[in-house]
């Protein structure tokens, strides 16, 4: 069995102070996706760069204390893709640290695991428009990916389609 976990950390250092490291050790996951790192590369100590024996790969936001995603894996990926690159032709979202993909390709099987943090859109009309632009980029990107490989998308997609999916429905 392959154990896959996804966590919105709301800050990796804060999560570590609240018990992330022993929790991850006890969980024995094969792969762990994280969102909202809120840390730069220089902020990641060795204990945060590798968790529970799983080395991590990260897409940090340029803005300090903002966004960022990562993937930790017990298994060596055949490739790692940081950011959307050419799939984000305007370059709007890569500076926000929203996408990291690990590829685990073997003869006869292509598999990707993606950790992604979709924009929320709840803070302003401008951010809602940014969220729509992000969705307009992601939909064709995932369709192209699906045509060439299997993938698992994990993360914080910031989409709730029913009132029951929201803690404080307004």
Predicted regions and their residues:
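Active-site-proximal beta-strand elements of phosphoester/diester hydrolases
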Residues: 2-10, 110-120, 154
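Soluble or luminal CAZymes and related metallo-dependent hydrolases
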Residues: 12-16, 94, 130-137
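Short catalytic/ligand-binding loop motif for oxyanion handling, primarily in non-cytosolic enzymes
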Residues: 13, 41-43, 65-66, 121-124, ...
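Short amphipathic alpha-helices and their capping/turn segments at secondary-structure boundaries
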Residues: 21-25, 98-108, 137-149
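Structured beta-strand-rich core segments of catalytic domains in phosphoester-bond hydrolases
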Residues: 38, 46-120
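Surface-exposed cleft-lining segments at the edges of enzyme active sites
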Residues: 84-90, 118-135, 168-170
């Amino acid at each position: 069995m392959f154990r896959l976990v996804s966590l919105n950390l709301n800050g990796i250092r804060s999560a570590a102070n609240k018990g992330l490291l022993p929790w991850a050790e006890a969980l024995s996951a094969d792969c762990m996706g994280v969102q909202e790192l809120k840390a730069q590369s220089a902020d990641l100590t060795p204990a945060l760069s590798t968790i529970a024996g799983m080395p991590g790969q990260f897409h940090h936001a340029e803005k300090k204390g903002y966004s960022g995603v990562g993937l930790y894996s017990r298994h060596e990926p055949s490739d790692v893709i940081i950011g959307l690159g050419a799939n984000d032709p305007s370059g709007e979202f890569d500076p926000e640290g929203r996408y990291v993909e690990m590829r685990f390709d073997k003869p006869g099987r292509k598999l990707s695991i993606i950790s992604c943090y979709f924009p929320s859109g709840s803070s302003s009309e401008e951010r809602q428009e940014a969220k729509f632009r992000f969705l307009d980029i992601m939909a064709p990107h995932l369709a192209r990916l699906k045509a060439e490989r299997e993938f698992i998308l994990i993360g914080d997609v910031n989409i709730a389609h029913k009132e029951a999916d929201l803690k404080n429905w307004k």
